[in-house]
Amino acid sequence: MSYEAFAYYYDSLMDQNFYNDYIQFINEHVKDYQTVLELGCGTGEIAIRLAHLGKQVCATDISKDMLEVAKYKCIDFKVDVMLSRIDMCDFAVDSQLDLILCLCDSLNYVIDLKNVKQVFENTYNALKKVDHLFLILILCIKWKQF
C-alpha cells in the first residue's frame, strides 16, 4: 500500500483512544524499559508519546511520507526520536534493545511467510531479553470485544 498522500491525513482517521490504551498498556507492563524500537511507526504517534515518558526511541517505517510527517510532529512536540526508513523484514541494530513494538496492524503488511519469519528472527536478535514483544496489539483488544 502506498502512503504517499494518505500519510498527511492518517492521524485524522485514527482513534486517539487506541494510542492512549497502547501507552497505558506499555507503561503498566514494561515501564522500566528504556530503549525502544518501533517497527511500522507510521506518523510517529506512539514513538512521540514514549519519548515524552523519557524513553529512548527509534521509530522506523518503510514509508518516507509517514516518516516525513513523524519528523515534523517530533519538532512540534519537542521530542527527540530517531527516525529511520527501513523495511521491518530486513533490519539489524547496533546494540540490543529493551523493547520492540510493532503495533496498529503493521505486521499485516508483510504477506510473505518467509519475510514474517525474518521479522521475528531480527526482533529476537535485537532484544536484550526475549520477554516482551508487542505485535498487532489492536487485534488483541478488538478480539476481546467479539
Cite the ranges covered by each PLM segment.
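Conserved class I S-adenosyl-L-methionine
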Residues: M1-G40, F134-F146
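Class I SAM-dependent methyltransferase SAM/SAH-binding core
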Residues: E45-D90
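A short acidic, Gly/Pro-enriched loop at the edge of an enzyme's catalytic core
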Residues: A92-L99
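Residues lining the SAM
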Residues: L103-D105
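A short His-aromatic
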Residues: N108-V110
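A short glycine-rich, Lys/Arg-flanked "PGG" loop and its adjoining helix->strand segment in the class I
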Residues: K117-K129
